[in-house]
Structure formats: C-alpha cells, structure tokens
A protein has these predicted regions:
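Active-site helical microenvironments for divalent-metal-assisted chemistry
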Residues: 1-95
Length: 95
C-alpha cells in the first residue's frame, strides 16, 4: 500500500484537483509524523491510515473525511497536537 494507489483512485473518480491537493497535504504530514513507526506486524505505521483513507475514498466520501482518516492517529502517536492539526487543516478535519 502506498499513496500512489490512493491518488490514482481519486484521479479515476475525477475528484477536483484542490481536493486531491488537500489529501496530499494530509498524507505528507501523516507520513512525516509517523516516520519510523512500525505496526506490530513490522510494516510501516502509515499503512494503516492509508488503508483507512483508501477504503473511505472507495466509498466516495468527501476529501475532508479522507484527509481526517490519514491524520487520525497523528495526535495520539506523535508530538503533533490537535491544535497543530487545526491550524494546518481547520476544524472540519481536526475534530
């Protein structure tokens, strides 16, 4: 699982470029924040939020929901705070 799979899904769905850009920004922050973290399986941690985001994209949910999925463990598992996410992405995504 990598971001290209999610991005290709979004493109195939003809999502607006600004929606894809929002999701890319969320992925970039999540990828950086979770750098070096592993799942119990040994896989990179980012696989979990990516898989969640892909499932939501396949369900045709909106860009804010997909971005929130990518970021959903950032506040729990990294030094980033909810206030950090709120500043970067707004209240709709950082809830």
């Amino acid at each position: 699982m990598n971001f290209a799979i999610l991005k290709n899904t979004l493109i195939a769905q003809k999502r607006p470029p600004h929606h894809i850009a929002l999701i890319e920004r969320a992925y970039a922050l999540a990828h950086t924040a979770h750098h070096g973290q592993k799942r119990m399986s040994g896989d990179p941690y980012i696989i979990h939020p990516l898989a969640t985001a892909l499932r939501l994209a396949e369900m045709q949910l909106d860009a804010s929901t997909i971005a929130a999925a990518l970021l959903h463990d950032v506040c729990e598992d990294t030094p980033h705070s909810l206030a950090d996410l709120r500043r970067e992405f707004g209240d709709e995504i950082a809830f």
